Swiss-Prot record:
Function as written in the Swiss-Prot or TrEMBL entry: Protein transport. Regulator of membrane traffic from the Golgi apparatus towards the endoplasmic reticulum (ER).
Annotated positions binding GTP: 16-23, 64-68, 122-125, 152-153
NCBIfam families to which the protein is assigned, alphabetical: small_GTP
Protein name listed in UniProt: Ras-related protein RABH1e
A GO CC term assigned to this protein in UniProt: plasma membrane
Chain residues carrying a lipid of type S-geranylgeranyl cysteine: 205, 207
Organism: Arabidopsis thaliana
Compartment list: Golgi apparatus membrane
Membrane topology of this protein: Lipid-anchor
Length: 207
């Protein structure tokens, strides 16, 4: 029987302007639900989830940061030891997309190239209000050399594929990352029994 490998832990920090849907993406991934009541994240929230892959298990530590300017000074310390930075914008809010350049630069300042960056265009369900095309998002990701995907936390669109992309890009996952993204290994999502306390403070983002 194969020996049991130690559980690898990876820190994912979610960044982006206020109200772009960072909390809602995490909530949809963790609990497969969407809360229509908007409640701004205060400071930093933490949750964790175990992902069961083909031949290993990883623990994802999800750090949800506040988008308000008054909390901006807290964020660099959370970026510093992160494995992944997930930078979210609202496809119906062009300014939030433009501001992702600063978020990417902040991550690179703190972590250099030693971090996986994922650019996420959220709220694709707002079709009639879209201000940022998928081509613009893809081009920006190519310019910065980061991963790109569009999602809708409200509709549950591309949430699992987002985390599959992240899992495939993690250190030690070379065999997974060599797989074509559209054929990536299926992930059995189960909530970790050691999820951080504080769930009761979590509010869904109206996205």
């Amino acid at each position: 029987m194969a020996s049991v490998s130690p559980l690898a832990k990876y820190k994912l920090v979610f960044l982006g302007d206020q109200s772009v849907g960072k909390t809602s993406i995490i909530t949809r991934f963790m609990y497969d639900k969407f809360d229509t009541t908007y409640q701004a994240t205060i400071g930093i929230d933490f949750l964790s989830k175990t992902m069961y892959l083909e031949d290993r298990t990883v623990r994802l530590q999800l750090w949800d940061t506040a988008g308000q300017e008054r909390f901006r000074s807290l964020i660099p310390s959370y970026i510093r030891d992160s494995s992944v930075a997930v930078i979210v914008y609202d496809v119906a809010n062009r300014q939030s997309f433009l501001n992702t350049s600063k978020w990417i630069e902040d991550v690179r300042t703190e972590r250099g190239s030693d971090v996986i960056i994922v650019l996420v265009g959220n709220k694709t369900d707002l079709v009639d209000k879209r201000q940022v095309s998928i081509e613009e998002g893809d081009n920006k990701a190519r310019d910065y050399g980061v991963i790109f995907i569009e999602t809708s936390a409200k509709a549950g669109f591309n949430i699992k594929p987002l985390f599959r992309k992240i899992a495939a890009a993690l250190p030690g996952m070379e065999t997974l990352s060599s797989t074509k993204q559209e054929d990536m290994v299926d992930v059995n999502l189960k909530t970790s029994s050691n999820s951080a306390q504080g769930e009761q403070q979590r509010g869904g983002c109206a996205c």
